[in-house]
C-alpha cells in the first residue's frame, strides 16, 4: 500500500473474515485497531500481536485511522462509520482490503456457495507442504496453525472469495476456484441466474496466464462453462472431469480415493475429514497444486498432515461413548452433505441439533430445509439465529419443525430456547450416539455444554 497509510481500523474486528486480514496487516508492520461488541479468543490474539482493540462502537475509536474497513454486517448507521465519513476518512469494504493484499502477491481465490473454507484450508496446507509458503486468509480456524491467517514469504496468497454481497468482484486472482454455485443470499441476489452471471464475471477477471478451476459435478457451474473466456480445468466424479476421483472409501474420519488427471492415474490420496463433498474439495486442491508444479508425493504428504478446520465436522468431545460434533453447515445442501458424511463414516444413531441462520435464508429456502434432514435419526430445532436481521412474520423455527414432521420425519422436537437444548439432549442421548450441532450462529455452545455435563455426571 502507498506509504501514507499507516493506521487501519476494522469495525467488527472479531469476525472471522475481518480478523484474518487484520492479522496479516499486523504481521506486515501496519498499526491496526478495531472494535467489536465483545471479547473473544480472536480479539485477544490480535491484542497479543499488537492490535488495539476497543469494546463497543463509538466514533472516537476512528480518530487516528487512515482508513476504516467494514464487513457487510456493518451498516451506515454505525457510529464509527458516521464519524469516519464526517472526518473524510475512507471507509472501504473488507473485500477491498483483501484485494489490496492480493495485489502484492499472486492470488488464489476460492469461491463457491459451499466448501470455501475447507478448500482454502486444504490448498493452504498442501502448498505449505510443497515449500510454496503462501500467505493465507481463511474464514475458519486452520487447526494445524491454530489461527485463520498467516503471512508467508512465498509469492502466493490463498484466500476465500465471498460472493454473499458480490464483493468478491473486487478481487483479481491469478487462480480462481469455483467449488459450486447454489441459491443463497437471496436477500442480495434476485435469483440463481444473477448469481451465475456474477460468478462468470468473477472468473473472467483472471489474467490471460491465470487458471479457473471449476467443479463439473455442479450443474450450475457446468452451465456457465461456455461463458468462461479464460483458461480453465475441471474436477469432479464425472468421467468428463479433468481431475477425477475413483475408489472412494470412507471409514470414520478417514477419506481416501485414487486421483486421476485426464485419464492418467496420479495415485492415492488420504486425509482425515469425512464426507463425499470433501473428495471434491480435495480434487480442487490437487488441481491448484498441479498448476503450481507440485510433485504428487508432496501433495499426498500435505493431505496426510491436513488437520481439518474449526467448525467443519469438529469433534468437541467424546464422553461415555457419546461423540459430540459441531459443524457450520447452515444451507440445505451443506446440511445434507454433512449428515451423509456422518452416516457414511459411522454406523451410529445420529442426533442433530439445528439452529436456522437468518430469517431471510429460512424464508427463501424453507422447502429445501424441510427435506434436508432425512439422514437424522433424531432432529431438534431451536429458534432462528437472527444475525442482525429483524423477524419476518410467519418465518419461525417452530413452523419449520412442524413442516418437517408433516413431510414424514418421525423424531422431530422444537426447543425454543437454545439454553435449554443441552438439558433436552441429556434426557435422550445414550452410548453410541453421535450428537451433531449444525448452524452458523451460536448453537455450538449447546454441544460444548453437553460435553461438560457428561463429564460431570457420576
Curated annotation (Swiss-Prot):
<keyword id="KW-0067">ATP-binding</keyword>
<keyword id="KW-0573">Peptidoglycan synthesis</keyword>
<dbReference type="InterPro" id="IPR036615">
    <property type="entry name" value="Mur_ligase_C_dom_sf"/>
</dbReference>
<dbReference type="Pfam" id="PF01225">
    <property type="entry name" value="Mur_ligase"/>
</dbReference>
<dbReference type="InterPro" id="IPR050061">
    <property type="entry name" value="MurCDEF_pg_biosynth"/>
</dbReference>
<protein>
    <recommendedName>
        <fullName>UDP-N-acetylmuramate--L-alanine ligase</fullName>
        <ecNumber>6.3.2.8</ecNumber>
    </recommendedName>
</protein>
<keyword id="KW-0132">Cell division</keyword>
<dbReference type="InterPro" id="IPR005758">
    <property type="entry name" value="UDP-N-AcMur_Ala_ligase_MurC"/>
</dbReference>
<comment type="similarity">
    <text>Belongs to the MurCDEF family.</text>
</comment>
<dbReference type="GO" id="GO:0005524">
    <property type="term" value="F:ATP binding"/>
</dbReference>
<dbReference type="InterPro" id="IPR036565">
    <property type="entry name" value="Mur-like_cat_sf"/>
</dbReference>
<dbReference type="Pfam" id="PF02875">
    <property type="entry name" value="Mur_ligase_C"/>
</dbReference>
<dbReference type="GO" id="GO:0005737">
    <property type="term" value="C:cytoplasm"/>
</dbReference>
<dbReference type="InterPro" id="IPR004101">
    <property type="entry name" value="Mur_ligase_C"/>
</dbReference>
<dbReference type="Pfam" id="PF08245">
    <property type="entry name" value="Mur_ligase_M"/>
</dbReference>
<dbReference type="GO" id="GO:0009252">
    <property type="term" value="P:peptidoglycan biosynthetic process"/>
</dbReference>
<dbReference type="InterPro" id="IPR013221">
    <property type="entry name" value="Mur_ligase_cen"/>
</dbReference>
<feature type="binding site">
    <location>
        <begin position="112"/>
        <end position="118"/>
    </location>
    <ligand>
        <name>ATP</name>
    </ligand>
</feature>
<keyword id="KW-0547">Nucleotide-binding</keyword>
<dbReference type="GO" id="GO:0008763">
    <property type="term" value="F:UDP-N-acetylmuramate-L-alanine ligase activity"/>
</dbReference>
<comment type="pathway">
    <text>Cell wall biogenesis; peptidoglycan biosynthesis.</text>
</comment>
<dbReference type="GO" id="GO:0008360">
    <property type="term" value="P:regulation of cell shape"/>
</dbReference>
<keyword id="KW-0963">Cytoplasm</keyword>
<keyword id="KW-0133">Cell shape</keyword>
<dbReference type="InterPro" id="IPR000713">
    <property type="entry name" value="Mur_ligase_N"/>
</dbReference>
<keyword id="KW-0131">Cell cycle</keyword>
<comment type="function">
    <text>Cell wall formation.</text>
</comment>
<dbReference type="GO" id="GO:0051301">
    <property type="term" value="P:cell division"/>
</dbReference>
<dbReference type="GO" id="GO:0071555">
    <property type="term" value="P:cell wall organization"/>
</dbReference>
<keyword id="KW-0436">Ligase</keyword>
<keyword id="KW-0961">Cell wall biogenesis/degradation</keyword>
Amino acid at each position: 500500500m502507498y506509504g501514507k497509510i499507516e493506521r487501519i481500523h476494522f469495525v467488527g474486528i472479531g469476525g472471522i473474515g475481518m480478523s484474518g486480514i487484520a492479522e496479516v496487516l499486523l504481521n506486515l508492520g501496519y498499526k491496526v485497531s478495531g472494535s467489536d461488541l465483545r471479547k473473544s479468543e480472536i480479539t485477544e490474539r490480535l491484542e497479543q500481536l499488537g492490535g488495539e482493540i476497543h469494546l463497543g462502537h463509538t466514533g472516537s475509536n476512528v480518530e487516528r485511522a487512515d482508513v476504516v474497513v467494514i464487513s457487510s454486517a456493518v451498516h451506515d448507521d454505525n457510529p464509527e462509520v458516521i464519524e469516519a465519513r464526517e472526518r473524510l476518512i475512507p471507509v472501504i469494504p473488507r473485500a477491498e482490503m483483501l484485494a489490496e493484499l492480493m495485489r502484492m502477491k499472486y492470488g488464489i481465490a476460492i469461491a463457491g456457495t459451499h466448501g470455501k473454507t475447507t478448500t482454502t484450508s486444504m490448498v493452504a496446507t498442501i502448498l505449505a507442504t510443497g515449500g510454496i509458503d503462501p500467505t493465507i486468509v481463511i474464514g475458519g480456524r486452520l487447526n494445524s496453525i491454530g489461527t485463520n491467517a498467516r503471512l508467508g514469504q512465498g509469492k502466493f496468497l490463498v484466500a476465500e472469495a465471498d460472493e454473499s454481497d458480490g464483493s468478491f468482484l473486487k478481487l483479481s486472482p491469478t487462480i480462481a476456484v469455483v467449488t459450486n454455485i447454489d441459491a443463497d443470499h437471496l436477500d442480495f441476489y434476485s435469483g440463481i441466474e444473477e448469481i451465475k452471471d456474477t460468478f462468470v464475471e468473477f472468473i473472467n477477471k483472471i489474467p490471460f496466464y491465470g487458471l479457473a478451476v471449476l467443479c463439473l459435478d455442479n450443474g450450475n457451474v457446468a452451465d456457465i462453462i461456455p461463458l468462461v473466456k479464460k483458461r480453465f480445468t475441471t474436477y469432479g466424479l464425472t468421467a468428463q472431469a479433468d481431475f477425477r476421483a475413483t475408489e472412494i472409501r470412507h471409514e470414520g474420519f478417514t477419506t481416501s480415493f485414487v486421483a486421476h488427471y485426464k485419464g492418467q492415474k496420479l495415485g492415492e490420496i488420504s486425509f482425515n475429514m469425512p464426507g463425499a463433498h470433501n473428495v471434491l474439495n480435495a480434487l480442487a486442491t490437487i488441481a491448484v497444486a498441479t498448476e503450481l508444479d507440485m510433485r504428487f508425493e508432496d501433495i499426498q504428504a500435505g493431505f496426510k498432515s491436513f488437520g481439518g478446520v474449526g467448525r467443519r465436522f469438529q469433534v468437541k468431545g467424546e464422553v461415555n461413548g457419546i461423540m459430540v460434533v459441531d459443524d457450520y453447515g447452515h444451507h440445505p445442501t451443506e446440511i445434507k452433505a454433512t449428515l451423509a458424511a456422518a452416516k457414511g463414516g459411522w454406523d451410529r444413531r445420529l442426533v442433530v441439533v439445528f439452529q436456522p441462520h437468518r430469517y431471510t435464508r429460512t424464508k427463501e429456502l424453507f422447502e429445501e430445509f424441510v427435506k434436508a434432514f432425512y439422514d437424522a435419526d433424531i432432529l431438534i430445532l431451536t429458534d432462528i439465529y437472527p444475525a442482525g436481521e429483524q423477524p419476518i412474520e410467519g418465518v419461525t423455527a417452530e413452523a419449520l419443525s412442524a413442516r418437517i414432521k408433516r413431510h414424514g420425519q418421525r423424531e422431530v422436537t422444537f426447543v425454543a430456547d437454545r439454553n435449554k437444548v443441552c438439558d433436552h439432549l441429556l434426557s435422550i442421548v445414550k452410548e453410541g450416539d453421535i450428537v451433531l450441532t449444525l448452524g452458523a450462529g451460536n448453537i455450538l455452545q449447546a454441544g460444548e455444554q453437553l460435553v461438560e455435563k457428561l463429564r460431570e455426571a457420576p
